């Protein structure tokens, strides 16, 4: 993902520090500067962005729907979400329609970012239909969605900067390196113990996702200190 049309870069001091740390990483390309770049990026993201709100809403709906499938079955859950029109549709069509609904058809940059993150998480967990979603581990799903969101957010903010003076292949390699670092930090340490508190009747719990997202930011910030011990 490059910088989207209409995207306005944040101007808070935390983002200035993040930009400097990314510049240092691009010059040095060592483990320490990479860890600091991710840490400063996570710190800047933790100050609050509209993209996080859109993602939390969409991911909360996905989690609630998945839990509903396991406890109430497909048709009842579709009815609870106001989607009786999808009853009888093919499982892959149902999943695509819900993803479109939960992300407002990618109407804004924030919605598009959420859609990219959810789609990436589904691919990572081999979820291609509502049937697959019914059997997924909710902890794994939440962790993958959050990891994908942070990675795509990094791309949104820094793809263009990283690509300056570099080939597409070089840019991809650098971003992949960052993505792997973030994934490694989160997959071992992010344990969403609050997942069982999702309230199906609320049609998703954005507050839960938001809380877990901030836990993820903290892990990424702390991972820099751990890597220097």
Model-predicted regions and their roles:
Residues 60-149:
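Long amphipathic alpha-helical segments with strong coiled-coil/leucine-zipper propensity
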Residues 29, 102, 133-137, 166-170, ...:
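Short coil/turn segments at secondary-structure junctions
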Residues 1-5, 136, 223-229:
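Short acidic DE-rich linear segments
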Residues 28, 32, 44-48, 65-68, ...:
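Surface-exposed polar/charged interaction patches
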Residues 1-97:
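Extended, helix-rich scaffolding/adaptor regions
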Residues 156, 160-229:
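Alpha-helical oligomerization segments
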Residues 40, 56, 112, 195, ...:
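N-terminal cationic amphipathic segment used for targeting or macromolecule association
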